[in-house]
Every structure is written in C-alpha cells, then in structure tokens.
From Swiss-Prot:
Protamines substitute for histones in the chromatin of sperm during the haploid phase of spermatogenesis. They compact sperm DNA into a highly condensed, stable and inactive complex. Belongs to the protamine P1 family. GO terms for biological process: chromosome condensation; sperm DNA condensation. It comes from the Eukaryota. GO terms for molecular function: DNA binding. Testis. The gene is PRM1. The keyword Transcription regulation does not apply. The lineage of its organism: Eukaryota, Metazoa, Chordata, Craniata, Vertebrata. Keywords: Chromosome, Developmental protein, Differentiation, DNA condensation, DNA-binding, Nucleosome core, Nucleus, Spermatogenesis. It comes from Lagostrophus fasciatus (Banded hare-wallaby). Residues 1-62 are annotated as: Disordered. This is Sperm protamine P1. GO terms for cellular component: nucleosome; nucleus. It is found in: Nucleus; Chromosome.
Amino acid sequence: MARYRHSRSRSRSRYRRRRRRRSRYRSRRRRYRGSRRSRSRRRGRRRGYSRRRYSRRRRRRY
C-alpha cells in the first residue's frame, strides 16, 4: 500500500492500465474454478506471472 502511494504521482497512467488488466484476469480465473485439471494449470501460470512481475520490479528498483 505504502509503495503504491509513493509511486502514484510518478506512474499514475501505468498503474491504471495494470489494474484493468488484473480485473480481467480475475474474471477469467473465476470461470475455471470448477475444473480440477485447469486448476493445476492456473497455478503454474500464476506462479510464472508473479515471478515475471517481481523480477521486473526488482530490476527497475536497483
């Protein structure tokens, strides 16, 4: 939360775009909630997505 408040003035448009994309991803995720097979697939995909985002953020920070 504090981090977002700090970089809000800096990259406001970027945050808004990311937020919209996130909501879309969440709606798609909800659709595959019942299936067990897609559940494992979703888990792997989510891990890769978060990992990519984290590495990108880390690289930018330093």
